[in-house]
Amino acid sequence: MATATATDPALDVLRRVFGYDAFRGEQAAVIDTVVNGGDALVLMPTGGGKSLCYQIPALVRPGTGVVVSPLIALMQDQVDALAALGVRAAFLNSTLSSEDRRAVERALVAGELDLLYVAPEGLRSRATLDLLDRTPIALFAIDEAHCVSQWGHDFRPDYLELSVLHQRWPSVPRIALTATATAATRAEIALRLDLEGARHFVSSFDRPNITYRIVPKDRPEKQLLDLLRTEHAGEAGIVYCLSRASVERTAATLVENGIQALPYHAGLPASVRAANQSRFLREDGVVMVATIAFGMGIDKPDVRFVAHLDLPKSVEGYYQETGRAGRDGLPSTAWLAYGLADVVQQRKLIETSDGDAAHRRNLGRHLDAMLALCETVECRRAQLLAYFGQEHPGACGSCDTCLAPPEAWDGTVAAQKVLSTVFRLDRERGQRFGVGQVVDILLGRDTEKVRRFRHQELSVFGVGDDLSENEWRAVVRQLLAQGLLTVEGAHGTLVLTAASGEVLARRREVRMRHEPARPVRAAKGRKASAAAELAEADVPLFEALRAWRAGEAKTQGVPAYIVFGDATLRGIATARPGSLERLALVSGCLVFTSDAADELQCVERGGRRR
């Protein structure tokens, strides 16, 4: 909580412009640093209020705040959201016509802008740099600062040029912000952006309102439909798929089943992507099915779930993508369907990726950490936070491993059977095969392929009849995750690793996990929705307020959350204010609009129906 007094200009802006009564977490300290001319490197989880950390100093300090952002497609929405609050904001990027660009430039030079958003590539232009020389600059904000990391999952080469900001304007404070960075990535950001002297602010990475669940993949589109129908009916969410074809197929399946779903991937025309993104942001209950091309910078507070139908490449990517759920602090779900084919596919992608051996090793380390998170029998939240160097006592009570702890078992003998089969195929026959053939050999199946290669003559043929096919596939998946097997080639053939010999020589025990018999539901079976935890009598009013908000948003041509967020509507439904004065006591309602009287009428009607 902030220590600011009522006369603090920053606190005054927070209340008067943004409608909040107090700062959260590190916000006050960050803002104080920048307002007083200091540099800052800010790590704050999605939904933690990063934007206020540069927007408020830009409004308090003289001059215009310049925000460097890679999110060209979202700049219009960001500017519109600020304009709705009375903030003078504009953007410069390649989408503007010459006439519109000149209008923005005139406004900037005339001192008529509080915030100017620019793309990083724009700062490589001498014309843009000369333009900024002609106006007082309040600060430089470098958003999505992890894009400067050459080892990161969102590397943008143009970010490497941003050290020019300090060289050209040494007295202007800079603030670099990201939601995702390990200690090594933080150090790289500071080095490459010339921020070694900046004060670091590292908030907790914990998102306690998100329930983390990773399930064995089995007909994933049906699993997804079950999740949406039972826990998130009519709610906004994001579904991530690895390929464009999977995006199109999944979106079509959802639409066929009565769900408002839209596709988003780089293969779609820019106009279609823009239209689908606009619908997702502005309408309630839309599900976006997308590749990872979608999501960075999406400022939609009421995303109730993020689902992955394919394995993310890294923990950083997983954390950033799941962090797009529940920005409003209300209960939300991060759900991942994960199977053997995911591991094989990701290993193949690494093997065939561009770059040198060091780059591939780094990709492998990222994947290993993601696989460890998937296969853990401990609290997933604790392991996720540990990856970012933060401690958690565990037993969070809101991840699948805490709600239904999986059993661990000694899988050493099973591992030896798999590894021995791979070894004998290679050593005795000079052959390499994928998972399916290895499992058929272990189960002693009389298939055409087994007979053709005379695999029934191997000593390991049929030694695995103590486990089912699915159980053997789970064993192979966990061996791949633990680095005791790897895959090679376009066909994903299984190959031993240096560590395999320790298991075959009985010098290493292999622990494995049994999956729970029944799927885990969010919050011990309760619906993880915006209406969760509301008293039953308050739910009708909450839904009435959401309907009123949808109408207002459509009339004003703005996203619904710009009118009021779900958290604010929950507060109103609970408090049932009967006057503007009482409405002002609800968090998020300090800034009144012309809609306030209409909203009170909605409350009165809802109260009569109680």
What label would you give each PLM region?
Residues C589-G606:
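Residue-level detector of conserved catalytic or cofactor/ligand-binding positions
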Residues V344-G397, P406-W409:
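C-terminal or mid-to-C-terminal helical accessory/interaction module adjacent to the motor/catalytic core
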